[in-house]
Regions:
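A short macromolecule-binding patch
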Residues: 425-444, 489-495
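Intrinsically disordered, low-complexity mixed-charge segments
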Residues: 482-516
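Electropositive polyanion-binding surfaces
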Residues: 1-436, 505-513, 529-532, 536-539, ...
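Hydrophobic/aromatic hotspots within intrinsically disordered, low-complexity regions
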Residues: 495, 504, 521-524, 528
Length: 562
């Protein structure tokens, strides 16, 4: 069966599970069947060239720009119910402890028994005697088997020490004219988690196969936190009486253990945000260094070839291995590939070069170029999605000028505080000139503004009441003022200047450090990234970001993104 969101149209994966006996041990046979896109999209044909150029599907609130033509993504390749479809299967044996003891890959034709949604499956798992279960009695035992293997895999995940940040994904609901009607949080239930763990297991098997056969590929790697980020987070934790274990090289388990310790604290959200910001971004690379956040020694993307080009490359590599051959991408115009790297990657490259540990140009392969290209296009797609969402949110809130809302401080900078509004899930800036007549010091370690005269503090996750004062659609910015202060002008001449203009004109808060580095935005890859390798969230990034603001708490993830 396939299990996806209500609005999904391209079905990459289908799952099946049954209990099996291996010797005296009770185990599970987990089958993850993935659409065989590589059968239809051949190297260097027109479809392949276009797919490589895009590298990923781009998800917007009301539409999707697919990596592949819809006749493939929603038709021939999509694992629709009651029709035969070509797949590449990962057939694995999972122990009761959640360990994959054996696996094999093979091409197969499947006939999906049903197209299920997360909510339908969650209802069945929550009540096997309920109306949803009564509608599909033949499927219930199979779903319970999947639920059992999920619990086993989840047990192994906890023992492994994988990090599981609790983040909120939002969903933008638009009317027929494309205008936002409401923004609502997307609930992540047990059905999401079942699929996530199944996809993670298949992705790990794919990476292991590449390693065992010494076949090159694009691994999904996630480096451990940098020395600079560790210093920042340890300084912050020390000030609140906490410590991150692990010394100079903490493990994912050290992070997970600390998160477990602070879970019940009133400042748990702030602490999670600071830990999240110490992370690096996951990227694609032929050089496997493991996945820090998921605590895997090797990890690759295999489960979403309809919407991610690296998964298609992994499929081609696996098929070559099955045939006893080697797949080497050829005929690719290197000059046409995206070579943009993130700031963090650029810093690491400079550091490696200074230490003489960098990869020399003569040693770079086509796989290196493809890893950089796919990583860059993934970031580009994310930025495009956020930009559209930001504009829509600005358009949504421009009718609410002068209205008051409660919210939480989601970012602190030298020029003000960013506030995410409750219920609306929209973010705006309260410029430092709107915080009162006090002179504010910016504490980089604590991520707070502190008034020198009054001692008033504004820190991440503080609750405030604000008023919408201005919306700049072109700049995608929302200006707020603290409620109870000077009345905001909301119409006619004399509208307050935009926060962007104020940020340029006003003297920013004095930083307590010579250089206050803004934290890089990090999206744990899962969900999901945490979640698993997931379809791009169609909502969640708030509008109103200033160019040089500190990163705000992550508000993402959906199905299987990691």
């Amino acid at each position: 069966v396939t299990i996806d969101g209500e609005d999904a149209r391209d079905f990459d994966d289908a799952v099946y599970c049954e209990p099996v006996k291996i010797g005296k041990e009770d185990c599970f046979r987990l089958i993850v069947a993935i659409a065989d896109v590589s059968h239809y999209v051949r190297p260097n044909d027109a479809l392949d060239v276009d797919a490589l150029e895009r590298s990923t599907s781009v998800y917007f609130p009301r539409r999707v720009i697919p990596m592949l033509p819809e006749k493939l993504s929603n038709g021939l390749c999509s694992l629709n119910p009651a029709v035969d479809r070509l797949t590449l299967v990962c057939d694995a044996v999972v122990s009761s402890k959640g360990e994959v003891s054996a696996y094999q890959f093979y091409p197969a034709v499947i006939h999906s028994a049903a197209r299920l949604t997360y909510n339908e499956v969650a209802d069945i798992l929550g009540n096997t005697a309920g109306p949803e279960a009564a509608r599909r009695p033949a499927i219930v035992p199979h779903l319970l088997n999947l639920y059992d293997v999920y619990h086993a895999l989840q047990k192994a995940r906890q023992l492994r020490g994988a990090i599981d940040f609790e983040t909120t994904e939002t969903y933008i609901v638009c009317n027929a004219l494309g205008k936002i009607e409401k923004i609502i949080p997307r609930t992540r239930n047990d059905a999401h988690k079942v699929i996530e763990e199944c996809m993670l297991a298949a992705n790990v098997c794919a990476a292991d196969l590449l390693i065992r056969h010494k076949h090159p590929g694009t691994y999904r790697i996630h480096a451990s936190p940098t020395e600079e980020k560790l210093t920042q987070v340890r300084t912050f934790l020390k000030q609140v009486g906490l410590n991150l274990a692990g010394g100079d090289k903490p493990s994912a388990g050290d992070y997970a253990e600390l998160m477990k310790q602070v879970k019940e604290r009133p400042d748990a959200a702030l602490l999670q945000t600071m830990l999240l910001r110490s992370m690096q971004q996951a990227v694609y690379s032929p050089d496997n260094i493991g996945h820090f956040g998921l605590a895997y020694e090797a990890y690759a993307h295999f489960t979403s070839p309809i919407r991610r080009y690296p998964d298609l490359l992994t499929h081609r590599a696996i098929k070559a291995i099955l045939l006893g051959k080697k797949y080497e991408p050829k005929g690719i115009d290197l000059a046409g590939l995206n070579t943009t790297v993130s700031n963090a990657t650029r810093k690491k490259q400079a550091k490696d070069k200074a230490q003489g540990t960098h990869k020399h140009e003569k040693d770079l392969t086509i796989w290196d170029a493809l890893g950089v290209h796919c990583s860059a296009n993934e970031r580009r797609a994310d930025e495009a999605s956020r930009d559209v969402e930001a504009w829509l949110k600005c358009y949504f809130i421009k009718d609410k000028l002068g209205e008051e809302f409660t919210g939480v401080v989601s970012g602190v900078t030298t020029f003000g505080i960013f506030v995410q509004l409750d219920a609306l899930y929209v973010e705006g800036l309260v410029h430092i000139t709107e915080l009162g007549t006090d002179f504010f010091q910016y504490d980089d370690a604590r991520h707070e503004l502190r008034g020198e005269r009054t001692g008033k503090r504004y820190q991440l996750t503080d609750r405030v009441t604000v008023q919408v004062s201005r919306v700049d659609l072109e700049a995608r910015k929302i200006d707020l003022v603290l409620a109870g202060g000077a009345a905001a002008q909301v119409s006619g001449a004399g509208l307050p200047k935009s926060s962007a203009a104020k940020a340029l004109e006003a003297k920013p808060a004095k930083s307590r450090k010579p250089s206050a580095n803004t934290a890089s935005r990090y999206e744990l890859d899962t969900n999901v990234d945490g979640g698993a390798p997931a379809k791009r969230s169609k909502g969640g990034s708030a509008a109103g970001k200033a160019p040089s603001r500190s990163a705000k708490p992550a508000t993402k993830t959906s199905k299987k993104k990691r």
